[in-house]
């Protein structure tokens, strides 16, 4: 999630020192005029709608129809069953193909705002914790107050370990026992505000991102006193932002908890960083068994040096030690996590020949023939590591990066790409073979309705790249195809691979656009094969809701629903996905899942895996029908045979079918 929109930021800037969702003036939501990777360099993209335009009533979150579809662009499908579903919080209409909704676990009471009226005293109380006084609140439209207060209790990302699910929240963390997926139970609710609360887990350690200025070292809920009122800007003058006053007890960075006692996590370290931690990536170095590494992506404002020595938000030409244009690397000794510390601050955007820190301001490796001015890349939003390949993919505001992480403390940029259809490079996922990477664009920052009928299907979409000789080669875009309403925040967000052998399939969150399962085996023709969606939370108000993350873990799809709670799903067979393929995916059992630390999937030698490949060979017509029939007959005979040698031989056949299978 990135900047909501500029007008909301300007309204809140004078009063609330909130998270980076509102504080990043540098994240313009307009496309670059550089040429598209999929078009000749002479082509110029259309102009995106102006996210800075305020409504007459001063409410930037009031539903507003999309402007006319730009010439040559394709919008979203209004004939899709997901369009115009009945609104509601817990009784919204639903539409699904290939997905069965099993259960919704509502948020624990402590993690709910408990108010839908901006005049509710609970709203003012929450905003007060962010440092807003009565004078500040008088300047902020009521709908903005409500949306801001809702954000303070938003569910965020997830991590998994054994039979435990760790569900982050801007207000802390909830830990569930999922040993019985049909009846998960809440083990621990840990109140610890500071947002976003994104988690990772490794052995007995839990890591949590914190970036908001109400975060405290002691996990306290009292926040900090509001700063003194600022002078009212002159007519036409932009409000000037300054970081909140230094506080010795403020925490912005990565918390580390010992979860040896899962019901009673103990904070053992709190590593401060200049911009806080919007997200982080756990790096497990196969050559270093004694340490793990954390890549910290900070996207918020730079704090004052009086609060953390060495912090500077100056431009690189004014201060070469600026906290902009870098990430931080934390080294965590597993035997003594209390000694965790920042060991490097890699300049991923630097030109190694000239030493210029902001070298990617004018783009990456393609589109050099046209005028360029992509989003300035002074931060990464998310970095996905694939340690088995020694690679990482960085989604870094104005660019997508390919990184060499063989030396995890010193990642090196291998390639960088930009795209005029992308507003904000948000996250990334590798294919299992490491030959493709799928990036996402969070156009509108997560609080924008960006799947309306006239919103182009190349904006706020996925972009699939092939990796060839350590370079990123563009394939095509994918966007959840169904049109959504004006009150539904919708854009590409977090997802994970589903371990279907022979295919690259990902389940992905689209906020109130629901979840979409995309097959990107063919990088040039990604296609949706399953989905689930609910109607909008409210018919006439654009509020933060929907899926932050949807991840596959050990046979189920788990959805972090921002406003409602935790959803659990299972796949069902369709013409695009057979029961054998689903069963083959269920043979993969992970002991741990941190999606930004991607693991190589390996399938056991089981006959159901061979059955899945045969189904794919039949679907793609790669083998004649009589050959398909004979293979199936051989498997069926072996399953009912006592001939162990024949059965073992057929099991060995399963992986050998991989090269022939296709979709």
Show which residues each predicted segment covers:
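Feature marking well-ordered beta-strand scaffolds used for ligand recognition
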Residues: 29-613
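Soluble extracellular-acting proteins and domains
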Residues: 581-663
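Hydrophobic single-pass membrane-insertion segments
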Residues: 25-27
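N-terminal secretory signal peptides that target proteins for export/translocation
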Residues: 1-9
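Bacterial N-terminal signal peptides
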Residues: 10-23
């Amino acid at each position: 999630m990135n900047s909501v929109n500029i007008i909301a930021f300007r309204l809140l800037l004078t009063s609330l020192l909130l998270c980076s969702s509102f504080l990043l003036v540098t994240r313009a939501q307009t496309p670059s005029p550089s040429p598209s990777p999929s078009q000749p360099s002479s082509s110029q993209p259309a102009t995106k709608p102006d996210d800075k335009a305020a409504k007459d009533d001063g409410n930037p979150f009031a539903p507003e129809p999309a402007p006319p579809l730009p010439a040559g662009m394709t919008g979203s499908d209004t004939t899709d069953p997901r369009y115009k579903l009945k609104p509601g919080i817990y009784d919204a209409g639903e539409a699904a193909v290939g997905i069965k909704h099993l259960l919704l676990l509502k948020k624990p009471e402590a993690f709910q705002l408990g108010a839908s009226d901006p005049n509710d005293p609970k709203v003012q109380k929450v905003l007060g914790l962010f440092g807003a006084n009565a004078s500040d609140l008088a300047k902020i439209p009521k709908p903005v107050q409500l949306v801001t207060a809702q954000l303070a209790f938003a569910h965020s990302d997830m991590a998994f370990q054994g039979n435990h699910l760790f569900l982050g929240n801007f207000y802390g963390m909830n830990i569930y026992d999922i040993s019985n997926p049909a009846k998960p139970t809440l083990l621990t609710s840990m109140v610890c505000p500071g947002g976003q609360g994104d988690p990772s887990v490794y052995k007995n350690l839990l890591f949590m991102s914190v970036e908001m200025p109400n975060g405290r070292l002691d996990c306290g809920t009292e926040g900090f006193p509001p700063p003194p009122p600022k002078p009212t800007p002159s007519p036409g003058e932009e409000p000037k932002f300054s970081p909140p006053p230094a506080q010795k007890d403020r925490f912005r960075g990565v918390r580390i908890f010992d979860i040896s006692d899962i019901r009673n996590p103990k904070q053992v370290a709190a590593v401060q960083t200049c911009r806080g931690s919007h997200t982080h990536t756990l790096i497990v170095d196969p050559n270093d068994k004694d340490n793990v590494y954390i890549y910290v992506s900070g996207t918020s404002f730079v704090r004052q040096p009086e609060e953390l020595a060495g912090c500077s938000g100056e431009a690189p030409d004014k201060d070469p030690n600026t906290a902009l244009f870098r990430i931080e690397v934390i080294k965590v000794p597993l035997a003594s996590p209390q000694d965790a510390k920042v060991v490097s601050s890699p300049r991923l955007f630097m030109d190694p020949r000239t030493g210029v820190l902001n070298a990617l301001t004018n783009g990456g490796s393609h589109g050099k023939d046209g005028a360029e001015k992509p989003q300035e890349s002074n931060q990464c939003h998310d970095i996905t590591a694939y340690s088995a390949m020694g690679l990482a993919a960085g989604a870094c505001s104005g660019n997508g990066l390919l990184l060499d992480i063989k030396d995890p403390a010193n990642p090196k940029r291998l390639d960088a790409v930009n795209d005029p259809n992308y507003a904000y490079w948000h996250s990334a996922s590798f294919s299992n073979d490491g030959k493709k990477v799928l990036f996402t664009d969070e156009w509108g920052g997560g609080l924008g309705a960006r799947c309306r009928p006239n919103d182009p299907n190349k904006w706020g979409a996925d972009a699939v790249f092939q990796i060839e000789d350590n370079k990123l080669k563009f394939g095509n875009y994918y966007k959840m195809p169904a049109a959504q309403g004006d009150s539904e925040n919708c854009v590409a967000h977090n997802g994970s691979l589903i371990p279907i052998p022979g295919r690259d399939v990902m389940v992905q969150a689209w906020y109130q656009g629901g979840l979409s399962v995309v097959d990107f085996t063919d990088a040039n023709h990604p296609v949706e094969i399953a989905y689930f969606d609910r109607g909008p939370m409210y018919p006439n108000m654009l509020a933060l809701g929907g899926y932050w993350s949807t991840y596959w873990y050990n046979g189920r799809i788990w959805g972090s629903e921002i406003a409602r709670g935790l959803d659990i799903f299972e796949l069902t067979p369709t013409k695009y996905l057979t029961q054998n393929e689903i069963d083959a995916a269920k043979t993969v059992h992970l002991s741990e899942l941190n999606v930004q630390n991607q693991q190589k999937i390996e399938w056991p030698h089981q006959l159901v895996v061979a059955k899945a490949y045969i189904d794919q060979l039949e679907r793609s017509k790669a083998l004649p029908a009589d050959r398909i029939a004979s293979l199936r007959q051989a498997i069926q005979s072996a399953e009912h045979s006592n001939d162990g040698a024949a059965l073992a031989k057929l099991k060995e056949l399963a992986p050998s079918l991989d090269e022939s299978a296709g979709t």
